[in-house]
Amino acid sequence: MSSSQNNNSSWIDWFLGIKGNQFLCRVPTDYVQDTFNQMGLEYFSEILDVILKPVIDSSSGLLYGDGKKWYGMIHARYIRSERGLIAMHRKYMRGDFGSCPNISCDRQNTLPVGLSAVWGKSTVKIHCPRCKSNFYPKSDTQLDGAMFGPSFPDIFFSLLPNLTSPLDDPRT
């Protein structure tokens, strides 16, 4: 990371700007600081100090590993909140997560999904609401699937059911 990045951006700005992290949305500072949202997360006070600083502190040792996991777990909680669903809806409507590779789905927009809510089990996949299948994303991302979790598409589409239509059933 260059020194100009150190002086001009926060840890969150830096992290969200890393190639491959485009599936993530910005979690607002007030949400991150709310102790209720931090319950069960390890080392939250040390990591919180680093990720909320207005400039990156490269001497902290938390530039990527622990900060990535901590932000990812807060992100997984945030995208289930009303504000988080709105942010993810915007990204979904823009097609930020890609489209379904199944030709029958006619380039249906997809959502990120984790196959597990446990950190380190798998990388993020994309989920098509039409064919109900999961695929590897075309984008170059190695985000942990726990940043979204396995229930995110179900929650999203149960609250916003008009965003997709099922595949035509040839039997009808």
From Swiss-Prot:
Q: How does it assemble?
A: Interacts in vitro with the casein kinase 2 alpha subunit (CkII-alpha). The relevance of such interaction is however unclear in vivo.
Q: Which domain of life is it from?
A: Eukaryota
Protein name, UniProt field: Stellate protein CG33246
Its family remark reads: Belongs to the casein kinase 2 subunit beta family.
Instruction: Tell me the Pfam families matching this sequence.
Output: CK_II_beta (PF01214)
Q: What tissues is it present in?
A: Probably not expressed in wild-type flies. In males lacking the Y chromosome, it is testis-specific and constitutes the main component of star-shaped crystals.
High-level lineage:
Eukaryota, Metazoa, Ecdysozoa, Arthropoda, Hexapoda
**Induction record:** In wild-type flies, it is strongly down-regulated by double-stranded RNA (dsRNA) interference mediated by Su(Ste) transcripts. In males lacking the Y chromosome, the absence of Su(Ste) locus, relieves such down-regulation, explaining why it is strongly expressed.
GO cellular component terms given for this protein: cytoplasm; nucleus; protein kinase CK2 complex
Gene Ontology molecular function: protein kinase regulator activity
Q: Please, what other remarks does the record include?
A: There are multiple copies of the stellate gene in fruit fly, encoding proteins that are extremely similar, which makes their individual characterization difficult. Thus, most experiments probably do not discriminate between the different members.
Give the function comment from the record: Unknown. In males lacking the Y chromosome, its strong overexpression leads to the appearance of proteinaceous star-shaped crystals in the primary spermatocytes causing meiotic drive, possibly by interfering with normal casein kinase 2 activity.
